[in-house]
């Protein structure tokens, strides 16, 4: 979860420090004592690792390249890379395949880094998550759900693509499309709000992405400006699928209380069963924020904000079109059974008069010119990333997998929790 600081004009900004405790917890260094120290020395000794009895103790395969082992800081492959990861396993992938260049984001369980693959020189965004932090919060199901959703998203123009995933003894790695046009939140911070044509373009691309997820029976559940990126041309890219709920049929519901406070729908706050229309409420909240600069029911006092969401009538200032007003009233309908999209889902959204200037076929083919061009000069252009991230040094542990915890119960538990995580595309996908 991205943590941002407030801008200089408090009247037009709001605090987004949610998840701070989780962020701090996720990055606390783990203490390593006793047997772990011995295991670390044993596992990093190339000669000892060749001995059959040592291999049996550590559950290691013999080193494939002793010269590489001695010259590279990455230790031998960890057991979590040797366990059965299913038919999509990519056990050969490892952190040392990448040159990690910059920190470009943070979340509750880890960091996102700009990385260049050492073989093909391609740039990727690599999301690195700490297994212990995930298990401590009992979030392993959400992580596996994110991985599953990413596998389904790879062909959609407005959803971030997963190239492959792999794991080490203590970390999970998502190798994703590198998007460097900046978060929508970053641009809203700078510009306060957007003109209606720009807000329409972004909300149309967002709606297309949500409609595609719904067609796969996936509810997104966490739409907010921090999870919406702009690519180098200015198109929307939706990212962070950790709160997605799979297998929700058109008339199906779920009941987990999750999301981000400013964008929670009334039925979620009521802890009632909710359906895919929760995403259309969030779209309304984001569109409102793009037009007015704040979420629709915002208050610095969370309890007051929740009360506003549940009970306060929607207030719309007169500086927007009647079409925009009508769309916001439909999306931000407190009764989900009357909300726009409750019957025909995305079809109702795209047929709304507000989107009449949009040619949806051209939009999905990226033939429509974005209203804003980030003007990035190349992969190393980081101007649209918060210096809070890019000024942070890249942790040395990111590029290697310390085997000091190989014999601990917690690592064995972590390996079992993430069986099937690793993924590599088939060769057919490259043809």
Swiss-Prot record:
In terms of InterPro entries, this protein maps to: AGC-kinase_C (IPR000961), Kinase-like_dom_sf (IPR011009), Pkinase_C (IPR017892), Prot_kinase_dom (IPR000719), Protein_kinase_ATP_BS (IPR017441), Ser/Thr_kinase_AS (IPR008271)
E.C. code: 2.7.11.1
Q: What class of enzyme is it?
A: transferase
Q: Where is this region: Disordered?
A: 58-93
Q: Does the keyword Nucleotide-binding apply?
A: yes
Domain called Protein kinase: residue spans: 98-355
Provide the active-site residues from the annotation.
Answer: 222 (proton acceptor)
A GO MF term: protein serine/threonine kinase activity
**Which segments cross the bilayer?**
none
Stated name of the protein: Serine/threonine-protein kinase Sgk1
GO BP term, pick one? apoptotic process
Q: Where is the composition biased (Polar residues)?
A: 81-93
What is the taxonomic lineage of the source species?
Answer: Eukaryota, Metazoa, Chordata, Craniata, Vertebrata
Q: Which SUPFAM superfamilies match?
A: Protein kinase-like (PK-like)
């Amino acid at each position: 979860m991205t943590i941002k600081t407030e801008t200089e004009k408090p009247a037009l900004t709001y605090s987004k420090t949610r998840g701070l405790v989780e962020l701090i917890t996720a990055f606390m260094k783990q203490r390593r004592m006793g047997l772990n120290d011995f295991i670390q020395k044993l596992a990093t000794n190339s000669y000892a690792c060749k001995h059959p009895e040592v291999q049996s103790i550590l559950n290691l395969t013999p080193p494939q390249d002793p010269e590489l082992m001695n010259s590279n800081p990455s230790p031998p492959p960890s057991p979590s890379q040797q366990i059965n990861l299913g038919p999509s396993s990519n056990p050969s992938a490892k952190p040392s395949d990448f040159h990690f260049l910059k920190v470009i984001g943070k979340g509750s369980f880890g960091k996102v880094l700009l990385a260049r693959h050492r073989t093909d020189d391609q740039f990727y965004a690599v999301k690195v998550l700490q297994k212990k932090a995930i298990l401590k919060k009992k979030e392993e199901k959400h992580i596996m759900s994110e991985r599953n959703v990413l596998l389904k998203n790879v062909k959609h123009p407005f959803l971030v693509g997963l190239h492959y995933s792999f794991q080490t003894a203590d970390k999970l790695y998502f190798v994703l499309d590198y998007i460097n046009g900046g978060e929508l939140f970053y641009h809203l911070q700078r510009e306060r709000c957007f003109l209606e044509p720009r807000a329409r373009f972004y909300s149309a691309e967002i709606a297309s992405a949500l409609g595609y997820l719904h067609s796969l029976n996936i509810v997104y559940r966490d739409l907010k400006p921090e999870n919406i990126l702009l690519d180098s041309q200015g198109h929307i890219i939706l990212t962070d699928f950790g709160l997605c709920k799979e297998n929700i049929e058109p008339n199906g519901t779920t009941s987990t209380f999750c999301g981000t406070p400013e964008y929670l729908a009334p039925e979620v706050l009521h802890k009632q069963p909710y359906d895919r229309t929760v995403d259309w409420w969030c779209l309304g909240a984001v569109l409102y924020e793009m037009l007015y600069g704040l979420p629709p029911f915002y208050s610095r006092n969370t309890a007051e904000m929740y009360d506003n969401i549940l009970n306060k009538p929607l207030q719309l200032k007169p500086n927007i079109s009647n079409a925009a007003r009508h769309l916001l009233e439909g999306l931000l309908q407190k009764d989900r059974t009357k909300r726009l999209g409750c019957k025909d889902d995305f079809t109702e959204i795209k047929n709304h008069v507000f989107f009449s200037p949009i040619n949806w076929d051209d939009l999905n083919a990226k033939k429509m010119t974005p209203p804003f061009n980030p003007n990035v000069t190349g992969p190393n252009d980081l101007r649209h990333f918060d210096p809070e991230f890019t000024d942070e040094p890249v942790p040395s542990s990111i590029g290697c997998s310390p085997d000091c915890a190989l014999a601990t119960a917690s690592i064995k538990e972590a390996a079992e929790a993430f069986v099937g995580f690793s993924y590599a595309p088939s060769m057919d996908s490259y043809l």
